[in-house]
Amino acid sequence: MESLSELSVQFSQLSMFPFFDMAHYVVSVMSAREQAGALDIAARSPMASWFSAMLYCFGGGILSSILLAEPPIAVLSNTTNIMLASTIWYMVYYFPYDLFYNCFFFLPIRLIIAGMKEVTRTWKILSGVTHAHSHYKDALLVMITIGWARGAGGGLISNFEQLVRGVWKPESNEFLKMSYPVKVTLIGAVLFTLQHGHYLPISRHNLMLIYTMFLVLIKVTMMLTHSTASPFLPLETPLQRILFGQRQKPSEVRQSASSSGAKGKPSKKTLDKDSGEQSKKKDS
């Protein structure tokens, strides 16, 4: 147990710059490039492509700044990170023969950088929770919101990023249909907020290690199995039925109404039989 505790302490002291930040930028820019029409936008308007990639890379910081009434442009003040992310953007989109993109698209390398990006997610959530606490003492909801925004800001502002590329898909709003990264970031924000308020009987560095190991394990498993379904789905479905009920779809309501109407309505054969019996009674 002591060795595990020492490991978690050393892990919590890891520096994200430059290697983990680089992995985050590479994965984010590659994700931006793989969106529909992204290469066409890069050829026609490099500035729009660059801005879209920066939203993927720094969306969490921008969104959390807006929520805390801080200048969102402050993200640009970190010249080193902006230059690093911009260099990676250029190499992902414009490197000759796509050698840079294809190198990191190679599955073993992509698994490594994807795992490193999940490590940065933990640090971003924790920094958001801590930053919110410095503004609003013990405001749990605010701390959860800012931690969530900083850890999953790129997904939460995806509609705005789509507008930069000239695309409008309101049905893809993360609040309507949350993706796995947004869900797991929300869970992480809740956990780190409860730990920060001493509501969880676990140290911060142990929680950081356990949560990060969970993130990396699930991410690698999903990539190896090519799964896009949320791992939380087996829990979400029964919980939704228990807590919020299971409402019938409009099509099911119409079908049930038509079937009940058909059951209550006599058939044509029955009507003909009844009318024949009534005519016989009249003749007699």
Curated annotation (Swiss-Prot):
One of the Pfam families matching this protein, by short name: TRIC
Residues exposed to the Cytoplasmic side: 34-46, 100-102, 156-177, 225-284
GO BP annotation list: regulation of release of sequestered calcium ion into cytosol
Regions that span the bilayer: 16-33, 47-68, 80-99, 103-121, 138-155, 178-195, 207-224
Quaternary structure note: Homotrimer; conformation seems to be controled by binding to diacylglycerol (DAG).
Primary role: Intracellular monovalent cation channel required for maintenance of rapid intracellular calcium release. Acts as a potassium counter-ion channel that functions in synchronization with calcium release from intracellular stores. Activated by increased cytosolic Ca(2+) levels.
Protein's recorded name: Trimeric intracellular cation channel type B-A
Gene that produces this protein: tmem38b-a
